[in-house]
Amino acid sequence: MIAVIMLLSFTSAYAQEAEETSDSAGWWQQTKNRLGNIADNGAEEVYLSGYAYHGRNTYTPERIRELNEKAWGIGGGRTFRNADGNDESLYFFGIRDSHFKPQLMAGYAYEWVFSVPKTPIEFSAGYTAMLVSRQDYFGGFPFPLPLPIAGIGTKKAKLMASYIPRLSSNKGNGDVLLLFARFEVD
């Protein structure tokens, strides 16, 4: 019985000490804190999509005529300009995919921002990690997808691009450049 009490006392003291240490939060708590900060303090944004370019060396002219390159869509999100001057975003987005079906996306993006001196213009480059739901993959079940992103514009309005690479030597998949705009509405 004394051993159990000593063990519980030791465990309790150890747990309290761990809670007081800033490094003890761990990656899960740090991730939750970061995402919570974006959600609470980020600027509200609207996303508009309109064009998906399919690589002409990947698809035959006949196939390109069958594909939808007018990837109309809308979404929303929040972007927080962090202490390093870079953008972190949480977003959701729905577009009409290459096969005229709905494609739903939700994710996180990180962009390193490079300002043009003495102008409001800035360039950005980074990555996004998202969950995507498409009818032609996994029956619409969401799957993870990391992609590169880039942008040009101002803090309040940017033309953005993301590239879906060709993942195999087979022609007819990937090699798509998606263009969209991001507008701050706060």
PLM features per residue range, with description:
Residues 48, 74-78, 92, 106-112, ...:
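Residues on the lipid-exposed face of transmembrane beta-strands in outer-membrane beta-barrel proteins
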Residues 47-51, 91-93, 124-130, 160-164, ...:
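Transmembrane beta-strands of outer-membrane beta-barrel proteins
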Residues 15-78:
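Short glycine/proline- and aromatic-enriched beta-strand/turn motifs that initiate or cap beta-hairpins
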Residues 33-43, 81-87, 113-124, 186:
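Short loop/turn motifs that connect adjacent beta-strands in outer-membrane beta-barrel proteins
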Residues 52-54, 174-186:
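Outer-membrane beta-barrel "beta-signal"
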Residues 68-74, 100-106, 141-146, 153-155, ...:
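Residues that define the transmembrane beta-barrel architecture of outer-membrane proteins
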Residues 82-88, 156-161:
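Repeated loop/turn-to-beta-strand initiation elements of outer-membrane beta-barrel proteins
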Residues 53-58, 95-99, 115, 130-136, ...:
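Sequence/structural signature of outer-membrane beta-barrel proteins
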